[in-house]
């Protein structure tokens, strides 16, 4: 069924630029974009429905390409402690930090995790997100990681959004493997990944390469295991120190390397040559009061595509707004509004391997788009909060109206 969407302007994000079409029209045929361009050039046709968008601006549906949205409990108490000057080391020694989230996630039922994650994700979806990634990594044993990944799959079946599932078993060392990181990595590679991939629960594999998590050599073992299973890889890298994990990610043609505050020029060059996307996470940078900025100029010099994501998680980025991350990326990291919009559309799609079907308003791609109540695209990075979407459209069907 063909629909005509008109009386609008469009920032198509074709090629990662605004690529603006004034007085635009868009034709959908089933779930796909059939035609887009100036309304004056609209070819004649029969349409089952004509939708007047009232002068709204259209953009591709937003894509949150890095979240940890499935978890038990929350850590608001620790947030208060940190503000009172208690160090993370003291909190962790008392059983807090990621260990507390692992306990709560292991104890929660699948239904409880599903309900809490859905509640967290609703604000993102109402604000224009039509695709997202969710990572596991708070289970850290086979049964609990399976539970998390099953919840992620169920969210994909129930939410009006495309949901990609990433296995992050190599997120932290579980308490039962204390002092035996190599043994845990072996367990991931020989048992967990084959089982979870065999059940169809995994779209990609991630790891945390950092001095408080896993070494590059350990991460490489995970990458090799993922490659043998035919799964693409991603990496948390260079958030707190430089271990050149981003260069390792580039060597394995990772979809993305994420955080990157401490990456070097050589790391950026390697990522540019490999086509690995840099996923920047200003929410975690802000909450942790970091001062080491990602090397944005180096990423630009080497042609590295930059995505922006919420990093929604209970410890370092309890962020329920992807649009807020656009403003943070501009004000904290000095990206342009155009770069940030590309970062939550086309480049975010690339970071999930979805660029053929998502991320820009082009013929043949899915008709996932948002009609915004704004006067120019830069407003998406300018306003802090507010209900800006007039309509959120997924697969040519309205899923939210403001």
Swiss-Prot record:
Top-level class of the enzyme under EC nomenclature: hydrolase
Binding site for 4-imidazolone-5-propanoate: 75, 138, 171, 239, 316
Binding sites annotated in the UniProt record for Zn(2+): 66, 68, 236, 311
Pathway the protein acts in: Amino-acid degradation; L-histidine degradation into L-glutamate; N-formimidoyl-L-glutamate from L-histidine: step 3/3
Keyword Iron carried by entry: yes
Cofactors, names only: Zn(2+); Fe(3+)
Cofactor note: Binds 1 zinc or iron ion per subunit.
Name of this chain's protein: Imidazolonepropionase
Catalytic function, reaction form: 4-imidazolone-5-propanoate + H2O = N-formimidoyl-L-glutamate
Source organism: Pseudomonas aeruginosa (strain LESB58)
Annotated localization: Cytoplasm
Function of the protein: Catalyzes the hydrolytic cleavage of the carbon-nitrogen bond in imidazolone-5-propanoate to yield N-formimidoyl-L-glutamate. It is the third step in the universal histidine degradation pathway.
Binding site for N-formimidoyl-L-glutamate: 138, 313, 315
EC annotation from Swiss-Prot or TrEMBL: 3.5.2.7
InterPro entries: Amidohydro-rel, HutI, Metal-dep_hydrolase_composite, Metal_Hydrolase
Alphabetized NCBIfam families for the sequence: hutI (TIGR01224)
Binding site for Fe(3+): 66, 68, 236, 311
């Amino acid at each position: 069924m063909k629909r005509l969407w008109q009386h609008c302007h469009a920032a198509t994000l074709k090629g990662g630029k605004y690529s603006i079409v004034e007085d635009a029209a868009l034709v959908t045929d089933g779930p796909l974009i059939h035609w887009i361009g100036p309304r004056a050039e609209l070819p004649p046709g029969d349409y089952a429905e004509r939708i007047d968008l009232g002068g709204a601006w259209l953009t591709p549906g937003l894509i949150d390409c890095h979240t940890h949205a499935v978890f038990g409990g929350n850590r608001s108490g620790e947030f208060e402690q940190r503000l009172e000057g208690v160090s993370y080391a003291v909190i962790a020694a008392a059983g807090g930090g990621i260990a507390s989230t692992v306990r709560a996630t292991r104890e929660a039922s699948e239904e409880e995790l599903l309900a809490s994650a859905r509640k967290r994700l609703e604000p993102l979806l109402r604000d224009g997100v039509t695709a997202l990634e969710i990572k596991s990594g708070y289970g850290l044993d086979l049964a609990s990681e399976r539970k998390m990944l099953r919840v992620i799959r169920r969210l994909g079946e129930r939410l009006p959004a495309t949901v990609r599932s990433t296995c992050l078993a190599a997120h932290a060392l579980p308490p039962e493997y204390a002092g035996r990181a190599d043994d845990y990595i072996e367990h991931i590679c020989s048992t967990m990944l084959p089982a979870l991939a065999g059940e169809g629960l995994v779209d990609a594999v991630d790891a945390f390469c950092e001095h408080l998590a896993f070494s590059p050599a350990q991460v490489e073992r995970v990458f090799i295991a993922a490659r043998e299973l035919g799964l693409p890889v991603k990496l948390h890298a260079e958030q707190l120190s430089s271990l050149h994990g981003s260069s390792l990610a580039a060597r394995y043609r990772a979809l993305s390397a994420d955080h990157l505050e401490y990456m070097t020029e050589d790391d950026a060059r390697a990522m540019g040559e490999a086509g690995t996307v840099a996923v920047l996470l200003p929410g975690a940078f802000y909450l942790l009061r970091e001062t080491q900025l990602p090397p944005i100029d180096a990423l630009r010099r080497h042609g590295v595509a930059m995505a922006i994501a919420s990093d929604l998680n209970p410890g370092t980025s309890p962020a329920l707004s992807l649009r807020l991350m656009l403003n943070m990326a501009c004000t904290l990291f000095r990206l342009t509004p155009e770069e940030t919009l590309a970062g939550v559309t086309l480049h975010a799609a690339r970071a999930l391997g979805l660029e053929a079907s998502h991320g820009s308003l082009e013929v043949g791609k899915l008709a996932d788009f948002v009609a915004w109540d704004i006067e120019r695209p830069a407003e998406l990075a300018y306003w802090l909060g507010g209900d800006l979407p007039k309509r959120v459209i997924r697969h040519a069907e309205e899923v939210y109206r403001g």
